[in-house]
């Protein structure tokens, strides 16, 4: 009865509402009667004259697009503008740049099409970059590399570090420019497509479009070498040899080489902000240089104590240059006479500089001084003639040295941003410097293979007809000890550290660092990691000519190492394959059976003929020799 009474009351209430507001009652819906627009019973905010008209959304139009732009890129531009809301889209086809432009395809092959766009805010850029990453992953089937995209979440470790940094106060070089996250996001897509998403302020400040302007030229230094950012940390006499795989790694310094040096005034590494020296200090510096140069001309180590006492007498330690000169002199003493000056004595010359109170104000950038000293100390550990110090000890000494000098840093020190530091750090993982370097390999190829070593022998093939490169070859027993000892645990730790740093900062391992590791693995006979790096490097090569060039270099390296198993692996697995795998014969045919130059062709021919002579009767080497005789 109660429910029936409630239902009756509800129906009465509905009838009242229908009569009061002009509503018709249905079982499931309520709707208004159609009334005139000027009816006063319609609220003002529901009248048609007060309703905004929908805006017409036009399809995005792109002006001045490069010709022959791939359809995938056009679809990408529509996605960036229509769906992600980016504006100011600019597309640059690097194939249209002049051949002498530093970003042209003739000088680099990583970037082909560059897209630059602006976002409304940092959150907008983060959302657009995240959606673009997911779109490329699912629609293109490619895991793209993105730099600069930082999530808003923060780990507990980061919060503790920020709190600790806040208690210390702002650094002396505090600068807010560029530190905000998601103001510049770079996305690397397949087929050389690079997308830059920036905030309007960051885009105006960086002006990336200027870098791709057709009028830009190389910015060379005074020696004609292309400028690189890390060169600012190096003195003029330490510029990197970029043509070498081991660029930045100096040749092994030993006692016999010091007597061949000409008398030159020493050049020390100083900071640009050092205070000017007085005439008396300049006279002292000249005297120290004179002692250094006089000792450099000595052909024995009997007078090392005399020169050391003479230098210490003239040393005042009033300038940073004095300490740098002392380090160079003590290092020379150590290299020529380790018994006179120990490694600890040379290390003390670097550490004493930071305990000298009178030179604190002479440099405005002690971070730069610390970076230079770390590089110097690394070179010292590599060049030291003391064989009793193994790789593990050197790595521990380096760690201890960095820990001591880093206490004097005014801001964060980014050593791994310097390529030379990575090169020298990897060199510490062996008991000595690799005797075979890229300079050796390049010189052999330039000499058409005339100085190629096989099994510790030197093949002199001068004045030999091109068709008979091994005839009348005089073989001398000038042995070359190519075997080195690798610190397995240290190499593993350094390798993983370098991989982590480079993948975080660059998205990949640089080719020159992979090649340095490859040379180390070959001379330490670590063939498991050697072939792993070989496959990784060959997969990153862009053209058949690059593969041919790299194959010839690898063959020359293995001939000098003279490991029969590795040579047979190269000339069987990677010489000719029946499947679709990359190999020399297939890439040689793709390249029109052409080499980079005649020197490369003759170097390959010489290496194959010498292998057939060194291992007579072996079918693998005989087939390679037949190819060289008939095709090269």
From Swiss-Prot:
> According to the UniProt record, where is the region Disordered?
257-287
Query: According to its record, how does it sit in the membrane?
Result: Peripheral membrane protein
Chief localization: mitochondrion
Q: Name one GO biological process term.
A: mRNA stabilization
Q: Which GO terms describe its cellular component?
A: mitochondrial inner membrane
Q: Where is the transit peptide?
A: 1-26
Query: What are the entry keywords?
Result: Membrane, Mitochondrion, Mitochondrion inner membrane, Transit peptide
Query: Which InterPro entries does the UniProt entry name for this protein?
Result: Atp25, NT_sf
Entry's localization field: Mitochondrion inner membrane
One Pfam match: RsfS
Query: What the protein does?
Result: Probable mitochondrial mRNA stabilization factor.
Q: Of which family is this protein a member? A: Belongs to the ATP25 family.
Query: What is the protein name stated in its UniProt record?
Result: ATPase synthesis protein 25, mitochondrial
Species per Swiss-Prot/TrEMBL record: Lodderomyces elongisporus (strain ATCC 11503 / CBS 2605 / JCM 1781 / NBRC 1676 / NRRL YB-4239) (Yeast)
Q: Which gene encodes it?
A: ATP25
